[in-house]
Amino acid sequence: MLMKQINLSLVFILLFSCSKDFDRKELNFLNQNFKQWNEYLGDKARTHYSSLNQINKSNVKTLKKVWEYKSGDLNGKNTTQIQCSPIVIDSILYGTNPVTKLFAINAKTGKELWKFDHGQDVGPGWWGVNRGLIYWDDKVDGRIIYTSGSYIYSVDALTGKIENTFGDKGKIDLRKNLGRPFETLSVVANTPGVVYKNILIQGTRVHEGPGASPGHIRAYDLDTGDLVWRFNTIPQPGEYGYETWPKDAYKYVGGANSWAGMTLDEETGIVYIPTGSASYDFWGGNRKGENLFANSLIALDANNGNRLWHFQFVHHDLWDRDLPAPPNLVNINIEGKLIKAVAQVTKSGHVFVFDRKTGNHIFPVKEFPFPKSELEDEESWPTQPLPTKIPPFARQEFTKDMINDMFPNSKALLAWTPNQKEKVSDKTIKEVFETLNSQGQFHPHSEEKRSITFPGLDGGAEWGGAAFDPNSGWLYVNSNEMPWVSIANKYDTPKEWEWQLKKDPVKSYGKSIYSQQCSRCHGADLDGISNIPGLKNLKNKFNKNELSLIIKNGKGSMMPMPQVSESQIKAMTAFLLDDDNIDLDLNSFRELDPNIVPYSINYFGRFMDENGYPAVKPPWGTLNAIDLNKGEIVWQVPLGEYEELTKQGFSITGTENYGGPILTDGGLIFIGATNDEY
């Protein structure tokens, strides 16, 4: 736990340690010596590596806190978080606070130099998450480029003043230039893009339900904010990959976005961009086909956005298997030959390694057959690619012999967090397991039987990504091993005039829209999930106008929903308020298709026991070292601890973990990722 508490302060110390000069050719594979931390995750190669070695295995235990900075905006509801990985430029540390206000502090003293307030009302949810910053040397004072909500801001690095010559008075609206009416789009960017020459290349995060925004990759001129190029991740007529979708999919399908960040090889001018699934994530009957470039690693010419090569990790994704982190540029030695490669970790617990220029596999990958989906109108892809040389760093299937037997008589809990005690079953973990479908990766969801996703929705690997040691060629990645449980719920989706046959057509329509857009967070039964509130008895709290505004504009951690039309908002309001007096022209229901989907995949959440421990045997979180020269896992250890279990004599179990590792030449790995906050 000490490592987690000191992680940020320690990073700052590492960045400012003086280092003797030395010549190591093996360190200079990107014409740098890894002594700076002026880029997200250390450098544009995303190595997470520092060559500084003054802090090492012999003295790390003597580290003490030398200063503390309070960034402000603490949320009293215990939902405050800072995901931002700071950067340091000329002894100034830049970061963002819980509501994404940008700050600059003296990295030696912790004294605040300035703070920039964007003036947006962002909450603690994904709408207000920022994971990193970009410094751009504009040959004047330098600028900090960062995102908050739907905007990219350009701020003077020395003064904290916005650069009014950039974009629209210092900012760019990420909802624009996507080929659809921007007022109807919900778009943010929680991870920084990358700068090549004077071009900013930026990905986005979008809504994951029906009607989501497309995830096209865009490049902007950093002097003006003007759009330079756009790569369509959902191809349009005449573009490569267009035939892998229905002919009009580019008009209505969303997602295939890059929320995880990207990686740049400045020597070749190639940018490597990982993407997520198409929306809706769990049912694809309205997007039949392979769905390029969703779930892909795309190599683009950074000058113009032209595609050089790509690889798709999941065809026609139905499991939300987004690529979770930017890839690592790696130099590896295979049988005496130097290979310049790019390595991508996945939520399913795999590492894929490619030749940087050609996209050829360095280690073999094979297409494996998987069962066909039985859901209405769904056409799952018959095969999925998996590596056959590098072993997975997470277990791939939850089998009966893996049931947690630490407390054999414990009842089962199906919930997002262990705080939902009301969802404790009257059956044991083993008894509940017997009722579930657990067949491993890429098995389709079912209407008839609840299914286990393992590793769960949060990996495998997560957004913290992997670290690469350029000396050894080893990759270090943390991983989750938590089972999640789901079932496909079919709901009423009549078309056009058929709604008129319903007993309460307006409220029925509203319930259908709610199921698609809101049930994933607030629950299919309006009871809420985890710390997300339930929506029962809203008529005692809001009138129809107040509730309509909340649905449209969002509130707190709830994102705005511009993709929901006025008639849909009216119908949802009627349903949520149980109001029979809201009139709606039934002809407006004709606007439904093509984004109406007949299923909501209801995630009961993590499969745990009544004490909040995972239903699967440990380890529940691991740290892994993988030798990319040989394609072998060198070691794997539990990451994280439940102290109360250790005191009872159990071996360290590991915990779920999200942040990524930092690797140093002092022989150390620092990682502040686990949830064991004692």
Task: Please place each PLM-identified region on the residue numbering.
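C-terminal motif of bacterial Sec signal peptides marking the signal peptidase cleavage site
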Residues: 14-17
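Blade/loop signatures of beta-propeller domains
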Residues: 24-66, 233-240, 412-447, 588-600, ...
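Repeat-blade elements of multi-bladed beta-propeller folds
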Residues: 37-41, 79-99, 125-152, 185-209, ...
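Periplasmic c-type cytochrome electron-transfer domains
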Residues: 43, 394, 403, 407-415, ...
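Extracytoplasmic/lumenal domain signature
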Residues: 59-72, 102-123, 140, 152-184, ...
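C-terminal substrate/ligand-recognition segments
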Residues: 84-99, 458-486, 497-522, 592-678
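Extracytoplasmic electron-transfer domains, predominantly the class I c-type cytochrome c fold
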Residues: 188, 501-508, 512-515, 520, ...
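Repeat-solenoid scaffold signature
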Residues: 188-221, 318-403, 458-467, 563-571
